[in-house]
Regions:
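NAD(P)-dependent short-chain dehydrogenase/reductase
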Residues: 138-199
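N-terminal Rossmann NAD(P)H-binding glycine-rich loop of SDR-like oxidoreductase domains
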Residues: 6-25
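Amphipathic terminal alpha-helices
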Residues: 6, 283-295
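NAD(P)H-binding glycine-rich loop region in Rossmannoid oxidoreductase-like domains
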Residues: 44-83, 92
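Mid/C-terminal beta-alpha module of Rossmann-like enzyme folds, strongest
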Residues: 203-257
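Catalytic helix-loop patch of NAD(P)-dependent Rossmann-fold dehydrogenases
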Residues: 80, 84-88, 108-150, 154-155
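Substrate-binding strand-loop-helix patch
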Residues: 158, 183-194, 215-235, 290
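Adenosine-cofactor binding site in Rossmann-like domains, unifying the SAM/SAH pocket
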Residues: 26-49
Length: 295
């Protein structure tokens, strides 16, 4: 790591969000360094040694264990990364007097709601992944009060496996795809989330006081996965990314049993972050159109 005053340290720089953040940070005047698996976030000594190599004023933690079903059989590893790793990073931030941005998830809720979840709503995770992320949030705020936790949902982007990539591939291979129509949420393009993270940093750096704590961010609007798939097909055909006819059919979650029940409703209320930063969040279908255009 370079010895450049006021660095942003991006942890998890090779993940789906981290790769997008790296790309956007490179276009700013903000000095940053990115690390990934070469530094074990479960190893406090390794984190401490890395932190001592440069002055850090911001840490972004986009590292996480995100395999929701696999986590049920891999609970110790999941907890090590999502809870202990998050706690370690927060402690490092506190020791270096850095501000922390920690990425979390809609899975901290049980998905039984009927209105968009607010930041202060009671959490009730139903699986190992959600539980470890919820416990990670608690540890972050305990270990470093100068933390921003951003919960997001239905994340997709250029890098890594995600729903949009899967649908584009399947729709070019099959005559029909079946997609669940009883789970409602809001897609999030990594470009939009990465952009708002950078906006948060720049806003705080400018001297504006943005209260620490939990914030929600997704794209605007809420839909089912079936709705999402239909729009992917529509946009894919219009933009030449899908070159054959493919029927998109609805089905129930019961037809695709999984180890962990997916949230039936995971819409997040974004009023707090919109007010705090004075931002307008793009609609989910607008962002999807731009994403497919860039593929």
């Amino acid at each position: 790591m370079t010895n450049n005053a006021g660095l942003i340290w991006l942890i998890g720089c090779k993940g789906m969000l981290g790769t997008e953040l790296s790309r956007l940070l490179e276009k700013t005047e903000l000095p940053f360094v990115g690390t990934d698996r070469e530094i074990d976030i479960t190893d406090m000594a390794a984190l401490t040694a890395a932190a001592e190599k440069q002055p850090v004023r911001w840490i972004i933690n986009s590292a996480a264990y995100t395999a929701v079903d696999k986590a049920e059989d891999d609970a110790e590893v999941c907890r090590a990364l999502n809870t202990r790793g998050a706690a370690n990073i927060a402690a490092i931030a506190n020791n270096t007097e850095a501000k922390l941005i920690h990425i979390s998830t809609d899975y901290v809720f049980d998905g039984n709601g009927n209105r968009p979840y607010r930041e202060e709503d009671e959490t009730a995770p139903t699986g190992v992944y959600g539980l470890t992320k919820r416990d990670g949030e608690i540890s972050v705020l305990k270990n470093n009060p100068r933390s921003y936790i951003i919960r997001t949902a239905w994340l997709y982007g250029k890098h890594g496996n995600n729903f949009v990539h899967t649908m584009l591939r399947l729709m070019n291979e099959r005559d029909e795809v079946k997609v669940v129509n009883d789970q409602r949420g809001s897609p999030t393009w990594t470009f939009d989330l990465a952009s708002v993270i950078i906006t948060l940093i720049k806003t705080v750096d400018s001297g504006k006081e943005i209260p620490f704590g939990v914030y929600h961010f997704t794209n605007e609007g809420n839909i089912t996965w079936f709705d999402f798939a239909k729009e992917i097909y529509k946009q894919g055909r219009e933009q030449g990314r899908i070159t054959k006819d493919c029927a998109v059919s609805p089905c129930s979650s019961a037809e695709y049993p999984a180890k962990v029940k997916r949230p039936a409703y995971s819409v997040l209320d974004k009023s707090k972050i919109k007010t705090a930063l004075g931002i307008k969040i793009p609609a989910w279908d607008e962002s999807l159109r731009e994403f497919i255009k860039k593929q």
